[in-house]
């Protein structure tokens, strides 16, 4: 073994240690590069403020041992500015002497400012081999031959596996006029998956371009409200359809003809996809006064007793003993009232009831 190692020249350097070589040459022991740089670095000559602050800083540090060095520097700066030019002159002359001496000692000196220390990065690069090795827990698993997919492909696929995606695409591409038993649905479901109501609305955008007048006309004709959600068989209609005589027409304010916009004109487009969407949720419950909009004025007038206001208008013409009370309605048994007065009273009662009804709704 020794004969083999003796044939190589690099084994001679192993005989003596590097420390022995350094000591034999009379050199100092090995030092770090930072210490060497501090020794070889040439300091700049002090200016007048540095010459003055050299002794003044020591004096302030003794007087205020608890102050930080930054606070001492602020105090020194204020004190230096407060000095007069006559007081600064000896320090300026001393600084000039140091500058000349520095030029004689280092004629080729050039000021090189120190570079700012770079902040160490906390996040270091991880070796790809180590990362792949830590992720692959099963050594016998087959690698993916398709490679890495982009983020756009992942968003389009939505995280579904390949087989499920193919089934969903096949279901979407299947024509709707075919036999329902021939269609294949994903995940082995006997019925198609429910679609989002927003997706169904997006498929038919033409219904959203209708104007308010067309919506009102369609609501009046009764072509939008489905039978299972309508609360009353009679829809809202205009007051022009109710026969009211001329004297009471000025007391009636106009009533809006547009019904509530909960069921918009796009209801039929959603109803066409009823097989895919399932049963829609019922409309939200409104207070009781909203249902008055869906009851016609004719029905309200038909339920009102026209003789209700006669007791207030004809009290002076009849005997109090002739009046009877039935529940909450007081009916008068007057026989001396002419038919013309009765019709006028009925018209005023109808107009008053209609006015208060429309006022309470609005």
UniProtKB/Swiss-Prot annotation:
PROSITE patterns the record matches: HMG_BOX_2, SOX_C
GO annotation, cellular component aspect: nucleus
Keyword annotations of the record: Activator, Developmental protein, Differentiation, DNA-binding, Nucleus, Transcription, Transcription regulation
Signal peptide positions (record): none
Induction profile: By maternal vegt.
Cited CDD domains: HMG-box_SoxF_SOX7
Transmembrane segments: none
InterPro entries linked to this entry: HMG_box_dom, HMG_box_dom_sf, Sox7/17/18_central, Sox_C, SRY-related_HMG-box_TF-like
Tissues expressing this chain: Localized to the vegetal hemisphere of blastula embryos. Tissue-specific expression in early neurula (stage 13-14) embryos begins in the ciliate cells of the epidermis. Starting about stage 24, expression is found in a lateral stripe on each side of the embryo, with expression extending more posteriorly as development proceeds. Expressed in embryonic vasculature, as well as in the procardia tube, endocardium, notochord and hindbrain.
Biased composition (Basic and acidic residues): 32-41
Name of the protein described by the UniProt record: Transcription factor Sox-7
Residue span(s) of domain Sox C-terminal: 246-362
Region annotation Disordered: where it falls in the sequence: 19-41
Protein biosynthesis as UniProt keyword: no
Residue spans binding DNA: 42-110
Residues in coiled coil: none
Gene Ontology molecular functions: DNA-binding transcription activator activity, RNA polymerase II-specific; RNA polymerase II cis-regulatory region sequence-specific DNA binding; sequence-specific DNA binding; transcription cis-regulatory region binding
Reported function: Transcription factor. Binds to the DNA sequence 5'-AACAAT-3'. Acts downstream of vegt and upstream of nodal signaling to promote endodermal and mesodermal differentiation by promoting vegt-induced expression of both endodermal genes (including endodermin) and mesodermal genes (including snai1/snail and snai2/slug). Induces expression of multiple nodal genes (including nodal, nodal2, nodal4, nodal5 and nodal6) and binds directly to sites within the promoter of the nodal5 gene. The endodermal and mesodermal specification pathways then interact to initiate cardiogenesis.
Pfam families the record matches: HMG_box (PF00505), Sox17_18_mid (PF12067)
Places the protein is found: Nucleus
SUPFAM superfamilies tied to this protein: HMG-box
Biological processes per GO annotation: cell differentiation; endoderm formation; heart development; negative regulation of Wnt signaling pathway; positive regulation of transcription by RNA polymerase II; pronephros development
